[in-house]
Amino acid sequence: MSKNKTKKGGDSTIALNKKARHDYFIEDKYEAGLALQGWEVKSLRAGKAHIGDSYVLLQNGEAFLFGATITPLNVASTHVVCDPTRIRKLLLKKSELERLIGLVERQSYTLIPLSMYWSRAWVKVEIGLAKGKKEHDKREDLKEREWQRDKERMMKNKGR
């Protein structure tokens, strides 16, 4: 008799960076692991993370996540110092790191975190290789979104 494995329902997303898609053209996406401490994992399980103002910086051939806030739980241990905005190392393959370093340094791309999510028992960060948008590009996107919304509304009302 085989055992049925129960899968936990729900969303595996911990945090989204909605501002990133508004402020940048996303050219390519990468998945990176995140080096965390124990209290950070517990806080992430509780969903206490914010990556809205964070960015990725490449130093000495390694990638680091700056500005991400993981709020510690109230029941955290007293002998561990919890720094909510500490710099966290991103875990990428060497070939991916070399490619990203080349693009960021030579072609003026920016690396920004798009989302933080669970992949099995591991926390992953989706990194976007991006270029900044100008103000007129943002307005064009807004007009396009409004047009799509109006078009949907017209099609919905037409069927009535």
UniProtKB/Swiss-Prot annotation:
GO CC, alphabetical: cytosol
Record key words, sorted: Cytoplasm, RNA-binding
Subcellular location: Cytoplasm
Record's keyword annotation contains Phosphoprotein: no
Molecular functions per Gene Ontology: RNA binding
Chain segments carrying region Disordered: 133-160
Keyword Cell division assigned: no
GO BP annotations listed: trans-translation
Family: Belongs to the SmpB family.
Function: Required for rescue of stalled ribosomes mediated by trans-translation. Binds to transfer-messenger RNA (tmRNA), required for stable association of tmRNA with ribosomes. tmRNA and SmpB together mimic tRNA shape, replacing the anticodon stem-loop with SmpB. tmRNA is encoded by the ssrA gene; the 2 termini fold to resemble tRNA(Ala) and it encodes a 'tag peptide', a short internal open reading frame. During trans-translation Ala-aminoacylated tmRNA acts like a tRNA, entering the A-site of stalled ribosomes, displacing the stalled mRNA.
Protein name as it appears in the record: SsrA-binding protein
Gene (name only): smpB
